[in-house]
Curated annotation (Swiss-Prot):
NCBIfam families cross-referenced by the UniProt entry: cobQ (TIGR00313), PRK00784.1 (NF001989)
Native species: Synechococcus sp. (strain WH7803)
Name the record gives this protein: Cobyric acid synthase
GO molecular function: ABC-type vitamin B12 transporter activity; catalytic activity
Gene Ontology biological-process entries: cobalamin biosynthetic process
Length: 494
């Protein structure tokens, strides 16, 4: 089990690295995180919802993601409330103060069922577990579902990861170990220092001090590698990145309060000529080459924030003065004219009494929320941007409700339910949107979309002969595993 001294210590990527290293050694690694809290989600081939970080770990292990790898997913939706997903299916919502009372036993049952499924399907496999947050939140230890309760249940050997970039790494480690209960401390088999900058021999004295004062070996010092991967559950590190050398296009991405599935932007972040700039409500939109509105867990509430902050009006002016705007899932819904949420699923508190709200009005769409979630992988040929040869795209749907056009407009895809395109004003502005998460993963289509922006700027066109982003992601996982093998001694864990 990979534990961390805090959230954001690097557990998810270290778990992914461990999975890839074990795969290289001929083993069958099985990534597993009993409970995750994240709005960055993936849909498995069976239509089950799971955290994206466990999907990434599955790819690192050379496996197809499956929701049994993340049997409990909590999706925050504001006001201390989360949607509860068990084994890929939504089973209700819960307030934080009622979680232990109402959901602890069902959650533990779901975790054991997920373990049973993985172990039955892969009797030769080795479970590679990821903890959550810190394992020693003393006010939460009785409710722990995914850290040391699970480690004790499985008698797992644990690696404790600490992020030296944040500072205070010695206090992080010593404090965490001091708060472990006597029965838990023997589970810790090694320590790992993550995100070290500079020559590793500069940490030799610190390594000796830790081993002398804790009695636990430091199994490795991982170098700073955050340029390889966006952070798994936080935008903080992504936003701290400097401007790319050679960036020719700037794309403004709206940092919605209930932002979800920001991994949709990974392929654009990976483009060497593209600079992403995250814009929160209340911040100036500026003059980007395009605006992207990503998904939202609380679409109406976030739309209300765009309206009240003036950022929504700025996006409207940008599009009608010739700009390009693209929305994914909730972002596309916001681009429409009318949104109705009679059941209050998407933040009705910000809407009118009947759950209705006016959208940004850049696409002639009406969305009505309700019914079962759409959870499925899709593939379709595309009609826009118009160019030859015809391209196809793949991705997944993850949304509630139904959207339809109020007046004739162009379809983004051959399947008319997957997206729409409309002109904005008389200066060449265009708005487009899709329900397809992962659309930017499709290399040829992504390059074709970027080339529309490059034409506006008089820039040379990029080649559309670009592989699916999964190939680049796999190469990054290899580089991560290379560093892990170089800098970490795994033997005490195996």
């Amino acid at each position: 089990m990979v534990l961390g001294t805090s959230s954001g210590a690097g557990k998810s990527l270290m778990t992914a690295a461990l999975c890839r290293v074990l795969k290289r050694r001929g083993e069958t690694p099985l990534p597993f995180k009993g409970q995750n809290m994240s709005n960055n989600a993936w849909v498995d081939p069976g239509g089950g919802e799971m955290a994206y970080s466990q999907a990434l770990q599955a790819w690192a292990a050379g496996r197809e993601p499956e929701c049994a790898m993340n049997p409990v997913l909590l999706k925050p939706q504001g006001d201390s409330t989360s949607e509860v997903i068990h084994l890929g299916r939504s089973v209700g919502t819960c307030r934080a103060e009622h979680y232990y009372r109402d959901w602890f036993r069902p959650g533990w049952a779901a975790i054991r069922q997920g373990l049973h499924t993985l172990e039955n399907e892969n009797p030769e496999g080795r479970l590679v577990l990821e903890g959550a947050g810190s394992p020693v939140e003393v006010n939460l230890q009785a409710r722990d579902l995914t850290n040391l309760r699970l480690a004790q249940y499985l008698r797992a050997r644990c690696l404790l990861v600490a992020d030296i970039e944040r500072g205070g790494v010695f206090a992080q480690i010593v404090g965490t170990l001091a708060l472990l209960r006597p029965v838990e401390r023997p589970l810790i088999s090694g320590l790992l220092i993550n995100r070290f900058r500079g020559r590793r021999e500069l940490f030799d004295e610190g390594r000796r001090w830790l081993e002398q004062h804790t009695g636990i070996p430091v199994l490795g010092v991982m170098p700073w590698l955050d340029e390889l991967f966006p952070p798994e559950d936080s935008l903080d590190l992504l936003e701290r990145r400097g401007r790319k050398r050679g960036a020719e296009l700037e794309i403004a991405v709206l940092k919605l309060p209930s932002l979800s599935n920001f991994s949709d932007l990974d392929p654009l972040e990976a483009e060497p000529t593209v600079q992403l700039r995250w814009v929160a409500p209340g911040e100036p939109l500026g003059t980007p080459d395009a605006v992207v509105i990503p998904g939202s867990k609380q679409t109406l509430r976030d739309l209300g924030r765009l309206h009240s902050s003036g950022l929504g009006s700025a996006v409207q002016r940008f599009a009608r003065s010739g700009g390009a705007v693209f929305g994914v899932c909730g972002g596309m819904q916001m681009l429409g004219q009318e949104l109705e949420d009679p059941e209050g699923l998407e933040g009705q508190a910000a809407a009118g009494g009947n759950g209705a709200m006016t959208g940004l009005g850049l696409l002639p769409l009406r969305t009505r929320f309700g019914g079962e979630k759409a959870l499925r992988h899709r593939q379709s040929s595309v009609h826009w941007p118009e160019h030859q040869p015809t391209l196809s795209v793949e991705g997944f749907e993850l949304h509630r409700g139904h959207t339809h056009a109020l007046e004739p407009c162009s379809n983004l895809c051959e399947d008319p339910s997957l997206g729409w395109v409309a002109r904005c004003g008389d200066q060449g502005g265009i708005a487009a949107g899709t329900y397809l998460h992962g659309i930017f993963d499709n290399g040829p289509w992504r390059r074709r979309w970027l080339n529309q922006l490059r034409i506006r700027r008089g820039l040379e066109l990029l080649s559309e002969q670009q592989p699916h982003h999964s190939r680049q992601r796999d190469a990054l996982l290899d580089r991560l595993a290379d560093a892990f093998e170089t800098h970490v001694n795994l033997e005490p864990l195996l």
